[in-house]
Amino acid sequence: MVIASGAIDRRHLSPFTPTSDDSSSSFFSQDLVPTERQVGFWNSESMVDHKGSKSVFASPLEKIQPNGANHAGDPETPGGQAFKGLDILSLSNLMRQENASGSPSLSWGEILTNPISRLGLSTRETAFVEPTTADQHVPGYGKGLSSSSLSEVFSGKSREIVSGVLCQSTGTHTSIYDSDEPLESMEAIEAQTIGDLLPDDDDDLISGIADGFEFTGMSTNQDDADEDIFCTGGGMELENNDSVKGDKVQDGSFKSQISSGHSINKQPSRTLVVRNITANIEDSDLTVLFQQYGDIRMLYTSFKHHGFVTVSYYDIRAAQNAMRALHSKPLGLMKLDVQFSFPKENVPGKDIDKGMLVVSNIDSSISNDDLLQMLSVYGDVKEISSSPISCTKKFVEFYDVRAAEEALHDLNKGGISGPKFKVELSQHGEAGSCLRQQHSREWKQDSLPHQPKNSSPGTIGKLGTKCQDNSTVHNLFSPVNQQLESPTQCISTTGPQILSSPIRIKSTLQHNNQASVGDLSGPLGQGNFGRGIQTLHPRSLPEHHNRICNNSKSMTVSGRNASSRQDGVDHNIQKVGPAGFCGHSFDQNNEAFGFTEIGSCPLHGYHYTWNHTNVFPQSPSAPILWSNLQHPMHVHSYPGVPPHMLNTGSYPMDQHHLGSAPDNGGSFGNVHSFHPGSLGSIGLHGSPQLYPSELSAFASSRGNFREALFSPVGGGFQSLQQMCNAINGRNPMIHVSTSYDATNDRMRSRRHDGNPAQSENKRQFELDIDRIAKGEDSRTTLMIKNIPNKYNCKLLLAVIDENHRGTYDFIYLPIDFKNKCNVGYAFINMTDPQHIIPFYKTFNGKKWEKFNSEKVASLAYARIQGRSALIAHFQNSSLMNEDKWCRPMLFHKDGPNAGDQEPFPVGNNVRSRAGRNRSLISLDTKDASPSSSPDQESNSVGTANSTCRTTLEQT
């Protein structure tokens, strides 16, 4: 047996070096061996006949010397044989031979780590070569396959096998010669080889392989993941963890600087962390973007250069609506990632308690309905629950923290005649944990997809099997604590059970009776999952018309009279109903007590009765008990189904309310105090349910936030809600009385934001027909809200012209350029203030006839007033670069052409929309056609309408 072995000098060779011609000791002078980066098997083209082939399994970090690099006679190559690695195929044959001879089976790792003893070779048959200096400095790269460099040499009928095994401790190479054997079929050899190569230990399988790769983006500090407020995922990574960590050190702790100690949380809260924000976006644009969902309490943009900002709302519904509408929505080149931010445990004044009041010294004769009527004048009440400790104490939760503050100050001063109460802010721990559980469940269920069409708009989710039909709602659920064992019990599963959070709705819900709960004043929208609760007491959810709580045998909590002040308690809240219901009605919004700012009536039907709380059976008078929530049910809230957008107030930076159109930096925001009846029928006072799931964040401006100039703070809100409703085609809203009376007006006027200036600013956009009739209000520009999204300019003009042709000279229907639908509102300028009265009677509080829409139109004053001001505002707008059907329209207001369209004057400094991906297209630049020529602008309205329709069809 001839044995030759040699040590390899790997120091001076290029990745692929042909063997020298005078290398007589090399069997193949022109063979190349793969470089260190080629991991795995590498077969030459001559593999079929196994001549001149090399199969190499190389370590990622190991360099393999080309054959013939060392010449015969070289001190490092005794025997004149060039070093050759052990061929894998030959090794497999060798292993089978050894196994056939009765030797114990050998693993690949054993052969590599102890090749001589394992293979049964005697020391006299093996020549050892002292490692070279280069070899001595080669570190061990683990054990197993990846720590060896192997190759083979076939020559004629004989085969010389020289094995070089670089041991981790010695770096010694061993050469072994084995006699030739007939080769099996390639398939058999390959199968056997793979089996032999795989190590017994999984660690061996991957050891050494990952050593050759540098995972520079992977953080080695586990604390980074804990401190990263974006660890909840979603969106694009902003940067390397290392750089983020450095920024943290430089800018200070996120915990202390972001939202005053807020951190990412799956649970609904009033504060959101929005990531993937473009650093060059203006703060005013962000204000417009966020303000359309409600009054902004704080917009924190210090970390904008890191790609994220935090925004806090007064109303929790605004935060939830913003999250649903904006999460995963494109902003620039990235999609926004919106997450709830919740106060740290060590932060005083928990976010969840800010909207909750503790009302003490309540007479037993006062029901939840009575208390609801008393408190709803301050704002929308989300929940009324009984204290588990005292029957004379109740927790009252407002959607908006400002409503809670107003109620606190007013009630303690004797603001309500009759029984005297002691009112104080809830302290964290008293009801906070229960609220968080309820909010979490509510948000989770609210995130479910659309409710079935056959589901009642205001139906309440199915209750758990343990719910019992008690005489009063508060006893709706048995006090069994087992109910708490299943966080998802009593959660309606009417809608698809698609939850982002880990908690799923259990099958036990199937046993719940789905009796119709009646018409809740507001559509539950997508978020509405429940079908009904047969166990609810007939009087459980009274109707509140004109703020009068009428016990209804149906679960309808019809919204207060449309004219009732928007501040009113969410009718669903009224679910709190006569005795309140154990399944506390929770508006999607996390903070139970934040009332919706202006006219944002709690989401009717959205306040899901979350029956997870066990009601004290012993205290039937206690409608809603949080106390029995012994097991916090934290249902992680993820954005899912967009809820109706409750209009919440306007951002302090731009105090435009109800019907006011924000200026360039304004918001589309929430309309606050528009006429009480305007949205009453919608069930959301001042804020129709909005399903922003398909809402384009910048619908009215094609990405230019400032173009959304007209959406009143509250109006835009409503319009957005409307838009979403129409887009999603679901959740008809229960029509609520839209009568207007002075009583409701007075009730509405009692509510203010704590800031007299803000309250006055909101009221200034309300329509007062009496003042108009007396000539005391000469404003002429109106905002029409809650327009079905499928309406185009032709349909809208046709509806208006039925009775009001010639009474207006300007109209603008903002369009969402993404889906070619309107955004839910329009602006119209009447030629005379007196024309507003018949126009108001025709549209305000009335449903739209087309598309089976349940939306109810409402009117409010726009911020920009007058034809000339409107023209000045738009003539240099980027809208002038858009198709004409997307632009504002002017009409002749007198003369024989009264009512006919006239050209809209274009300014000399028309702005271009930044980031526009396509070339500007305007009918002015297109090939002239009868329907698109600029000359045709003076044609009749019918021609203009035809143009609108044609353009829509073409696009």
UniProtKB/Swiss-Prot annotation:
Key word Cell membrane present: no
GO MF term (any one): RNA binding
Alphabetic keyword roster: Repeat, RNA-binding
Region (Disordered): 64-83, 436-465, 897-955
Source organism superkingdom: Eukaryota
Domain RRM: 270-343, 355-428
Ranges annotated as biased composition (Polar residues): 935-955
InterPro entries: MEI2-like_RRM1, MEI2-like_RRM3, Mei2-like_Rrm_C, Nucleotide-bd_a/b_plait_sf, RBD_domain_sf, RRM_dom
Pfam families xref list: RRM_1, RRM_2
GO process terms (BP): positive regulation of meiotic nuclear division
Its job: Probable RNA-binding protein that may play a role in growth regulation.
UniProt protein name: Protein MEI2-like 3
